[in-house]
Amino acid sequence: MRRFHWASGALALMSLAAGLQALGCFPLDYTERDHGVTPGSGSAGGEAPREPRCVPGLQEGPDASCGIFVSVEAGPRGDGSKERPFNTLAAAIDAAAGREPDQRRIYACVGTFMEKVVLSADGIEVYGSLACDQEWRLAEEDRRTTLGAGPDEIPLTIVGGGGSTRLEGLEVVARPAARPGGSSIAVVAEKVKLELVRCTLQAGDAKHGESSDNYEMDAQPGRVGGDGAPACSALSGAGGISDPLECDEDVTVGGIGGQGAPATAGQGNPGSPEGATNTGGIGQRAAAFCSVGGPGGRGQDGAPGEGGVGLGQITRSGYKGVDGANGARGRPGEGGGGGGASRGRFEAARCPAMGPTSGAGGGAGGTGGCGGLGGRGGQAGGSSIALISLASELRFQEVTLVAGKGGNGGAGQHGQIGGAGAEGGKGGDAPDGLQDGCAGGMGGHGGAGGDGGGGTGGHSLAIAFKGMPVPPSEGQGFTAELGEPGAGGPGFQGRDGATGNRAIALGFDE
């Protein structure tokens, strides 16, 4: 990994500092580490230089009147002074925000602050990694002020009104993501001039996107068609009726059976949705028998969902990847056609004396099964991002940006299997010498739901930015360490999600 150092500048500055010290301009410890004097540093936007008495060094700490003091080991009743520091960064930031713009300095002791911090006041300067037991001087290199938060939380969010914020000697660490598709993001900066000096921003590994389990049950099956009325009955040979089956916005219903009259026999009605095969059965004609209703056709399968593509979105809340598209719902099976009816007879010998002389009704067609639900698309994998910059101006000096691994996209889910079609109703019974009515047709099987597409893989990024200006390149005050991007989630029939990106800086402008 390439690393950038201000080596030659530092040697020249130390020589200059020694000469200036001899003239009594400022103490040597002020120049022993960069404090905004080397190239590429200084207050963003050309603010006035910082007062030497307020800048901690190796030999001397800041003056007590310079700002707010905070230590994680302090008691709960601190007032922000050197003697009684606050014990949370949030309290120190609130206190600093109420001071004059040139007095908004915060001095933080070595230690780990576990809190989610939002910094929204312009002009804040935070000096970390100070040895509180040594008059708030700069601590040794291996002793740091660290800011962390819980899983799936962004430890530090900086929101400005176009003003500047300066952080020095801080280590901001985002924990590995915990929820499915979660991201790990160390810092978000929005509309601010942000200067980072001797800081490390470290994001943990992101989480893989969720893959839904396949459906355990088929879609709702069809309903059996009603039976036709028997011959010689008071029901006048009525055909069977099928109750409609509602499948979301679709409806499937079997055709009504034909009606049996004394001298004629009706034809069954076609099922719905109408197709090529679910016609109604023919009623009895002379010596020819009636016919059963035609079977309903299979419902159309739902279209598969496409795999997720695109970079996703970055906002103050973090990162949101692109999920795979859901598959479309299958269409219901066609209802079976109604069965044809049979004729009655006027002869008293065929039906009871003085009773009805109707023929037998045809059975209703069975309804089709409902179409299967579409498979859910795979969830996008989370991203590991050291710094999100939203329309912010960034300046770095001896900064390390660390990103972990992006999460893999979730797999697309198989669509639900369509419901089975139902049997048609039976034709009505008839006494000897008359024909029974004919049965209704079988309902069609519901179409399968379309399979879901795979989710996008997450990114591994040092800087994710949106809006101007474009952030500096690696070597301009910072080095970067990156993990591997997440793989796209598998879809079906090649509809995989896109693989994530591994980049020093990646723009998300549309």
Language-model segments: residues:
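C-terminal motif of bacterial Sec signal peptides marking the signal peptidase cleavage site
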Residues: Q21-G24
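Right-handed parallel beta-helix/beta-spiral solenoid domain characteristic of secreted/periplasmic
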Residues: I124-P180, I185, D205, E216-D218
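The right-handed parallel beta-helix/beta-solenoid scaffold, focusing on the short coil/turn
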Residues: C66, R104, E115, D122-I124, ...
